[in-house]
Each structure stands twice: as structure tokens, then as C-alpha cells.
Amino acid sequence: MSKYIISEKALEDINNIWIFTAENWSVEQANRYYNIILDEIEFIAENFETAKDFGHIRKDYRYSKAKSHLVFFRKTKHNEIEVVRVLHEKMDIKNRLID
């Protein structure tokens, strides 16, 4: 397994996704969705180059889709994969990635 790190903002995103899903659907659905997101993170950590380039918005960023969410990654200077954010596809992605 390739090494990856998850930023504080991405952890907050994932936590908020779980809470929203549990409150609006069910804990079981929240757990399933959480696992889908983590599976995508692990896949990209192993296959970084398969993620789509997002450099037109943020230099060196890539993303991959996990259901209705986009998982944003970059490589660190130590060649680790950093999960930067996990955002819903209908959010204002550009502004969310700036903050």
C-alpha cells in the first residue's frame, strides 16, 4: 500500500459527509459511503496517475470521483499522496480549494 496522508480539511469533509448521510438516510448508508470514499483514496494512493488533472485550478492537484464527491489529491515534496479535500460535485470547487 502506498503511503498517503489526509489533511485536516479533508478529514473534516469526510466527517461532515458521514454526519449528513447518517442524519438524512441512515448510519448504515453513512458507513457504506465512508468506505466508498476511503476505497477511492486507497486506489488513488496506489494509482495516482489515473486521477484526473486539476492543475488549471490548483497547480499539481488531481482528483477522482467517489459517487457524488470529488477527492482532491496532490503529491508532497516527499512523494507522499496528500488528500487535500473531499467535496460534493455541486459545490463551488474553485473557491473551496482556495481556502
Question: Model-found features: residue ranges?
Answer:
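Solvent-exposed interaction patches of small proteins and small membrane subunits
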Residues: R32, H56-I57, K94
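Short proline/glycine- and basic residue-enriched helix-capping loop/turn segments at helix->loop/beta transitions
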Residues: E42-E46
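Enriched for short, Lys/Arg-rich terminal
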Residues: R74-D99
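Basic/aromatic recognition patch in beta-strand/loop cores that engages polyanionic ligands
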Residues: E49-H78
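Arg/Lys-rich, positively charged N-terminal/basic patches that mediate binding to nucleic acids
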Residues: M1-Y34
